[in-house]
């Protein structure tokens, strides 16, 4: 309607530049009431029940303004006896008299609603007092405390009615004796109310004292400012995003410090809370704390809030992480300096009143409930998350990796602290988490790197620090003793962590060239029997152990053992996944499709812990070459040998694909180099075979063991090439000179004789050495020559093609 008249009528007025929409009288009342609330905001905490009267002067005078053409009942302000458009609304259609009887609609502010709820709570407690219904009293008193927190979050201070509720419940508790209560449930509710009201009364001691002196002053539904109760001055200290007190006022008494701390604690995790403001408040409280107890409590609350700030992020930002690291370090320094007076431990009883220090035990030590090592664990987790979310090929990854030493230092430092504060009979059980974290950081490192990490970590702890389990020393075997000690303690105390500790120990031994011991430990552990039912993280660790064990066998040139160990793992279709070396995005997709509950970060390993997949392929294919090429030569020469199962990555399958290819160029990839080495071995050209394998750049990942491994590998290639030569060409010879074979393969005569004798005993080569062991004499058998072999093959192919053509002609 307004849109229609705005087009049909034009007016010019200085009081308005825009067209006004048609308002009902009820809407005008709401607007006028809201305007009055804004005007009277100076007395925000004073209850005001007076409402402004509606002025009808404009309706009595001459119409003017943009709505002069409207009927009186629709004009702004309305007619004296009408309600404007509201009379056409539902419920207002009977008569104007009925509308007047209904009265005006009251719109209450959030403050008024909260005060009404507190008044209702007061009345319900008053009614429950008559029947001694302590269950209802407890429920309503808890509701009142929640409403107080809500009021303080809205900058309303402490309502007077809340003070009356506390005084009411306090008097009721004092008048009631627990002996009078027979019902167990009611008695339990009574005890809970007694504890809660004592705590609340202590926090509002000054207000209660004023209430006792002048109860009539608290009859009005007003609120007491947070600063007025403690004579605070306005300053820049921010609490929950609002100014509450200056620094000098807060430190004026311990109750002020804990009152501010209590507000932060009560509002933590609630919707609409400004976490950054909480962090700033806690930082201020840490800086102004006067006693060690205040500092400890402040740190125990500041550090979790820092972690809460990044709960929805992929990982904690570097600046926040370093701030958390500094806070944990400062907390440990504080606890170490006051270890004779305060102990922070998970075994301490819960203290309901943080304002009061816990009572000292028989040793004069006050036990504070908390977990320092939980903070260290969270720091370590955030560190790993940041590595997983950083490009591993960038300099940022290397810069971030430098912080690993500081994390390990904190792990060791927290372990030493826990050893001092935990009871001796249960210390080992609670220290298992710390030991596993230490193993997480050292099990994949060589002995030299572990020595560097340990030396730096022990240098960072206070002087004269020692562990009752193992302390750093210059003993060359210290690193192995360290891993053995940590794994032994964990395995004996925690059954859930036993498998993980055992696998850590096996991995460390395999990595540091202790293949025999590592293999023996893996067989005795029986982990393989139940690995399919284990946690995905244990399965990933087991696969890594198996691969590392195979690499350890290869370094010792134990080709058969290496091939047997790596055969199942290396031929898996998703090797990267089962090794925990896939990207976070891929893991997230797999988890969403499979419904796995394991956290994404636990299924991935940082890049510096990865085992190079090209190295695994190179080792497996090289072992396959040394085993399968002589076996294939023996099989094709008519010797009955045991069939070897082969996989997609075996050299036999690779050669089949290679021979089918139309173009065979020079080697480029790792696979090409191994295939060309295999072809050279088939021809008996061992030198060329070694050159092809040496040209693989992946061998540099073997470190300082590379040259030694390649030398052993070259010797093994010479021996296997000798076997292949004998199997392939024995059909063309009646006898072979041992001396000639020695010169051809650059092997000592004794070694050539040993190889031939081994073939005689294990494989029926239909030949033997003469008495002087100078000649290998072959018995004439039913072997076919190469020409006969080609003729037979051609005959079979011709027959097959002929049958195929006959079938085609018959169909036509």
UniProtKB/Swiss-Prot annotation:
A Pfam family that the UniProt record links to this protein: eIF-3c_N
Q: Where is this region: Disordered?
A: 1-105
- Highest taxon, organism lineage: Eukaryota
| SMART domains linked | PINT
GO CC term (a single one): eukaryotic translation initiation factor 3 complex, eIF3m
Where are stretches of biased composition, namely Acidic residues? 17-40, 48-59
Extract one GO molecular function annotation from the record. translation initiation factor binding
State where the protein is found: Cytoplasm
Chief location: cytoplasm
Domain PCI: residue ranges: 607-783
Q: Which UniProt keywords apply?
A: Cytoplasm, Initiation factor, Protein biosynthesis
Does Nucleotidyltransferase count among this protein's keywords?
no
Extract one GO BP annotation from the record.
translational initiation
Regarding protein family, the annotation reads: Belongs to the eIF-3 subunit C family.
Quaternary context: Component of the eukaryotic translation initiation factor 3 (eIF-3) complex.
Q: What does this protein do?
A: Component of the eukaryotic translation initiation factor 3 (eIF-3) complex, which is involved in protein synthesis of a specialized repertoire of mRNAs and, together with other initiation factors, stimulates binding of mRNA and methionyl-tRNAi to the 40S ribosome. The eIF-3 complex specifically targets and initiates translation of a subset of mRNAs involved in cell proliferation.
Query: Would you tell me the protein name for this molecule?
Result: Eukaryotic translation initiation factor 3 subunit C
Per the UniProt record, the source organism is: Eremothecium gossypii (strain ATCC 10895 / CBS 109.51 / FGSC 9923 / NRRL Y-1056) (Yeast)
């Amino acid at each position: 309607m307004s849109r229609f008249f705005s087009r049909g009528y034009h007016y010019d007025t200085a009081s308005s530049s825009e067209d006004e929409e048609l308002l009902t009288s009820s809407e005008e009342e709401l607007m006028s009431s809201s305007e009055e609330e804004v005007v009277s905001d100076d007395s925000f905490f004073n209850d005001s029940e007076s409402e402004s009267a509606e002025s009808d002067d404009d309706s009595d005078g001459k119409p003017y303004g943009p709505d002069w053409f409207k009927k009186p009942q629709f004009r702004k302000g309305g007619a004296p006896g009408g309600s404007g458009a509201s009379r056409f609304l539902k419920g207002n259609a009977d008569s104007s008299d009925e509308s007047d009887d209904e009265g005006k609609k009251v719109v209450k502010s959030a403050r008024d609603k909260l005060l009404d709820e507190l008044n209702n709570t007061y009345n319900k407690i008053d009614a429950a007092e008559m029947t001694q219904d302590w269950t209802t009293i407890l429920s309503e008193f808890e509701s009142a405390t929640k409403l107080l927190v809500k009021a303080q979050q809205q900058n309303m201070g402490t309502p007077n009615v809340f003070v009356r509720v506390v005084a009411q419940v306090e008097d009721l508790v004092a008048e009631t004796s627990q002996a009078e209560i027979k019902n167990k449930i009611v008695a339990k509710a009574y005890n809970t109310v007694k504890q809660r009201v004592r705590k609340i009364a202590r926090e509002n001691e000054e207000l209660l004292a004023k209430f006792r002196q002048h109860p009539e002053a608290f009859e009005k539904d007003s609120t007491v400012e947070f600063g007025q109760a403690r004579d605070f001055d306005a300053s820049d200290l921010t609490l929950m995003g609002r100014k509450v007190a200056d620094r000098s006022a807060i430190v004026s008494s311990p109750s002020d410090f804990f009152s501010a701390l209590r507000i932060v604690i009560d509002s933590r995790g609630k919707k609409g809370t400004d976490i950054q403001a909480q962090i700033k408040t806690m930082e201020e409280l840490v800086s102004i704390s006067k006693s060690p107890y205040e500092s400890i409590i402040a740190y125990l609350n500041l550090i979790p809030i820092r972690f809460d700030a990044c709960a929805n992020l992929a990982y904690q930002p570097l600046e926040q992480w370093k701030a958390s690291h500094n806070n944990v370090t400062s907390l440990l320094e504080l606890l170490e300096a006051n270890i004779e007076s305060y102990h922070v431990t998970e075994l301490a009883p819960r203290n309901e009143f943080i304002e009061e220090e816990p009572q000292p035990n028989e040793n004069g030590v006050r036990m504070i409930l908390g977990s320092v090592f939980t903070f260290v664990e969270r720091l370590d987790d955030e560190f790993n998350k940041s590595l997983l979310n950083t490009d591993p090929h960038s300099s940022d990854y290397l810069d971030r990796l430098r912080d690993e030493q500081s994390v390990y230092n904190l792990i060791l430092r927290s372990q030493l602290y826990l050893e001092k504060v935990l009871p001796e009979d249960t210390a080992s059980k609670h220290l298992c988490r710390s030991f596993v974290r230490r193993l997480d950081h050292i099990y994949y490192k060589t002995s030299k790197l572990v020595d560097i990490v340990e030396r730096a970590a022990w240098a960072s702890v206070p002087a004269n620090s020692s562990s009752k389990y193992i302390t750093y020393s210059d003993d060359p075997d210290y690193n192995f003793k360290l891993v053995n000690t940590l794994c032994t303690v964990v395995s004996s105390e925690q059954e859930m962590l036993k498998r993980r500790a055992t696998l850590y120990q096996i991995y460390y031994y395999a990595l540091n060239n202790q293949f025999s011991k590592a293999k023996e430990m893996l067989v005795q552990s029986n982990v393989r029997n139940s690995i399919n039912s284990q946690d995905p993280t244990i399965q990933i660790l087991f696969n890594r152990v198996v691969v590392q064990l195979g690499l350890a066998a290869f370094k010792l040139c134990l080709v058969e053992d290496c091939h047997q160990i790596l055969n199942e793992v290396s031929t898996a279709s998703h090797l990267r996944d089962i090794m925990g070396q896939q990207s976070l995005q891929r893991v997230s997709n797999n988890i969403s499709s499979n419904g796995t509950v394991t956290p994404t970060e636990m299924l991935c390993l940082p890049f510096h812990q990865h085992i190079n997949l090209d190295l695994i392929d190179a080792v497996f294919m090289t072992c396959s070459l040394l085993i399968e090429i002589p076996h294939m030569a023996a099989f094709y020469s008519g010797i009955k040998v045991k069939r070897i199962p082969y996989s997609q990555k075996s050299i036999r399958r690779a050669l089949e694909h290679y021979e089918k290819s139309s173009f065979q160029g020079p080697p480029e990839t790792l696979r090409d180099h191994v295939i060309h080495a295999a072809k050279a071995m088939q021809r008996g050209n061992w030198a060329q075979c070694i050159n092809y394998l040496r040209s693989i750049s992946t061998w540099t990942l073997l470190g300082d063991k590379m040259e030694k491994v390649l030398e052993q590998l070259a010797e093994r290639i010479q021996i296997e090439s000798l076997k292949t030569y004998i199997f392939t060409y024995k059909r063309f010879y009646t006898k072979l000179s041992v001396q000639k074979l020695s010169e051809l393969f650059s092997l000592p005569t004794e070694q050539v004789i040993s190889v031939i004798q081994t073939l005689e005993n294990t494989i029926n080569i239909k030949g033997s050495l003469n008495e002087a062991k100078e000649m290998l004499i072959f018995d004439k058998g039913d072997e076919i020559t190469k020409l006969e072999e080609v003729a037979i093959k051609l005959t079979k192919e011709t027959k097959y093609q002929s049958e195929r053509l006959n079938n085609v002609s018959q169909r036509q």
